[in-house]
Amino acid sequence: MGNPLFAKKPMSLLLAESAEAGTHSLKRTLGPFQLTALGVGAVIGAGIFVLSGLGAHYAGPGLMLSFVLSGMGCAFAALCYAEFAAMIPLAGSAYTYAYATLGELIAWIIGWDLTLEYAMGASTVSSGWSNHFIELLNMFHLRMPLWLAYDHWTALSTAEKEVARQIAISSDSTLVPGTQAFLDKVSSIMATPSPDLLQRAHELMNAPRIFGMEIGFNLPAFIIALVITAILVVGIKESARFNSAIVVMKVSVVLFVIGLGSRYVSVANWGSDWHTFAPMGFSGIGAGAAYIFFAYIGFDAVSTTAQEAKNPQRDLPIGIIASLLVCTVLYIAVAGVLTGMVHWQDVNIEAPVARAFMDRGLSTASHIITLGALAGLTSVMLVMLLGQTRVLYSMANDGLLPKKFFAAVHPKYRTPYKNTILVGLLAAIVGSITPIDDIGRMVNIGTLLAFVIVCIAVMVLRHTNPGQARPFRTPWVPVVPILGILFNGYMMYKLGWVNWARLIIWLVIGLVIYFAYSRHHSRVSNPDRVEIPNP
């Protein structure tokens, strides 16, 4: 008998589970358009409305090439995902694929790792959604207390920046807010914080205290995560309709940005040669690509809905590849408009697209873009939470998590409601108390690891099951998977040792859970184990 740690889930069992249509199975209601919309909904959001600003400061007008490079890395992984999604149409995404090819331990690791992409990704996006919601309130001259608008650390940093602005204005009446000289003065004040600055910042927060520490709780992030959770509990069909409506809205806003913004593009801003187009050279373009990778996270969530697709063998590859193509084209176009409207050195980092239009005097357009960003981030949260709950559902059905809880299907809505509520609550809490930057970097490295494992798994399964029917085949194997491994592995390397350390700690926690519970309850490693059916 082989090592149970590397026991593989037989393809025959996977295909039998795919064909099974029992009382407690998920409803098959999603077609190719809805699956593509889910993918677009997961991808378009923080990247196009927020991260393009910082990417421009690395790559200059070459940001367009940064999106191409980042998209290529995702495309290699997407082609591998598409082969698995068509061949193994089960909820679970990379987790299920790893179980069939690399064994149970690796499958557990990737399932645990996917929590970084989906649940923590939803937390990241809920915090970003909150920032745009607060910006929307500001447009109507409404203010939230800082301690209810941000987590503690972000609230204090925001208060310090606001006080620094006040000090800059009072110290030099010639400074004009918004100019580079003003911003430099504010940065100088914050770089050498004085007792007066810190005291006034704490007064501005005006937050209640627990055990002597000021409270910081991002209330909008908490509420929006719970609202999305409630929508997911009601049902996948209703969730898909809600998501499709939002996707139509935000794609319309993106097309609006491209159409109107192109009228204000100055070709001179793109530069006249390679050195002005890519002021930091190819290394700057590569750095921009690594940073904006978050912009592409989410397309793989389409594969987690395999058991809810009407014709998964045909529709899942369409949904995965079409959503990635649509998003890449839109990203490149927006990057071109952004760096054409504003010189790359003047691109705003916090709200680059909206600010570019505001600086042109197009305030109404800027407001529309802010609303589009809110819609975009809402749909990203929906798809990420959806993906997480379906991965947990698959792991529970395999015995790696308690089935009575994580695979419990609502008798009316036919959704895994218990694990949906748990995941939504955890995402809401993390998003409301944790700085967005810290979660975002963890999401990046976790997602890249999943991509690398899927690329490896395609090559393994081609060797171990060469005769298996494949409705969609990844082209040019092993070239495409190897390129996916190299490209995504390089971006993992660029994320630095701190994030590697965080990833290792997270995986160690997962391994403790596996050896304490999962390996003893696994259906594959313990085929004679008697299961108690779900009520």
Sequence positions of predicted segments:
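C-terminal membrane-solvent junction of multi-pass transporters and transport-like membrane proteins
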Residues: M213-G216, I228, K404-Y417, F451-W500, ...
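Select transmembrane alpha-helical segments in multipass membrane proteins
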Residues: R28-G39, G103-L116, A221, P279-I292, ...
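Membrane-interface loop-to-helix entry segments
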Residues: S130, M213-Y264, I320-I321, G440-I453, ...
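Membrane-interface "cap" regions at the ends of multi-pass membrane proteins
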Residues: M1-S52, H57-P61, A75-L79, I88-A91, ...
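Helix-loop-helix junctions that connect adjacent transmembrane segments
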Residues: L14, A21-K27, L63-M64, R143-A221, ...
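Membrane-helix boundary/coupling elements in multi-pass transport proteins
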Residues: F49, D113-N131, Y291, Y296-K310, ...
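Hydrophobic alpha-helical segments of multi-pass membrane transport proteins
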Residues: E135, V253-V257, V391-L392, V443-R470, ...
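Extracellular loop-to-transmembrane helix junctions
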Residues: I48-T158, S323-V326, L330-A333, I505-V508
